[in-house]
Swiss-Prot record:
The lineage of its organism: Bacteria, Bacillati, Actinomycetota, Actinomycetes, Mycobacteriales. It comes from Mycobacterium tuberculosis (strain ATCC 25618 / H37Rv). Coiled coil: none annotated. This is Antitoxin RelJ. GO terms for molecular function: DNA-binding transcription factor activity; sequence-specific DNA binding. The gene is relJ. Keywords: DNA-binding, Repressor, Toxin-antitoxin system, Transcription, Transcription regulation. Homodimer. May form RelJ(2)-RelK toxin-antitoxin complexes, in which the toxin is probably inactive.
Length: 91
């Protein structure tokens, strides 16, 4: 979805609710340059993905793990709660 900056200004609060509900970013166009409105959760997930894939070696390991999982050869034996506990209890 793409809207003008003027329209975004008029519809800001409904747009914030929309991107948090449907997780579809909204492109806001203006003469000064375009911007994107997206949920903070989606933004944080993108930032985490960029961080994890920044290292070519880490990216390779992650892609191999995804391929193993898709092939049904997942070595994942701990629950999310167990992993959270191992990581210090953070969500």
């Amino acid at each position: 979805m793409s809207i003008s900056a003027s329209e975004a200004r008029q519809r800001l609060f409904p747009l914030i609710e929309q991107v948090n509900t449907d997780h579809q970013p909204v492109r806001i166009t203006s003469r000064a340059g375009d911007a994107v409105l997206m949920s903070a959760d989606d933004y944080d997930a993108w930032q985490e993905t960029v961080y994890l894939l920044r290292s070519p070696e880490n990216a390779r390991r992650l892609m191999e793990a995804v391929a193993r999982d898709k092939a049904g050869h997942s070595a994942f034996t701990k629950s999310v709660d167990e992993l959270r506990e191992m990581a210090g209890g953070e969500e």
